[in-house]
A protein has these predicted regions:
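Arg/Lys-rich, positively charged N-terminal/basic patches that mediate binding to nucleic acids
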Residues: 1-28
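Short aromatic/hydrophobic contact patches that present stacked aromatics
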Residues: 11, 50-52, 61
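Active-site micro-motifs of SAM-dependent methyltransferase domains
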Residues: 12, 31, 81
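ATP phosphate-binding glycine-rich loop
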Residues: 58
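A short, surface-exposed loop/turn module that caps and links secondary-structure elements
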Residues: 27-53
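Alpha-helix boundary/capping and short turn/kink residues
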Residues: 18-22, 34, 38, 78
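Residues that form or immediately flank small-molecule/cofactor binding pockets and catalytic motifs
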Residues: 9, 49, 78
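Enriched for short, Lys/Arg-rich terminal
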Residues: 1, 55, 63-93
Length: 93
């Protein structure tokens, strides 16, 4: 099982959501410590080691460091726009 980091990022995002949606996202995030690269994950172009998984209408962006067996959740955001990618770019630049 991988270590899971960045849960405070997830919890902050979940506060404003409906409980059912928040639970779906939380379940998806927690599953990453068991399977850091699930079949539905996609590696982000231009960001080595960064991946995304979708949970309903939301994107979960995380970094997987296999040498440390660490999953770090970086961002969670809506899928209907590219704001989450812009936030990632600002965060890493």
């Amino acid at each position: 099982m991988a270590k899971l980091d960045g849960l405070e990022t997830v919890l902050d995002f979940l506060k404003g959501l409906q409980p059912k949606i928040a639970a779906q996202i939380a379940k998806k995030v927690l599953a990453l410590n068991v399977e850091p690269l699930p079949h539905d994950s996609k590696q982000l172009k231009g960001y080595p080691g960064f991946y995304l998984v979708n949970s309903g209408e939301y994107r979960i962006i995380y970094r997987f460091q296999p040498d440390e067996d660490l999953v770090e959740v970086v961002l969670v955001g809506k899928r209907n726009d590219d704001e989450v990618y812009q936030q990632l770019k600002q965060l890493l630049d």
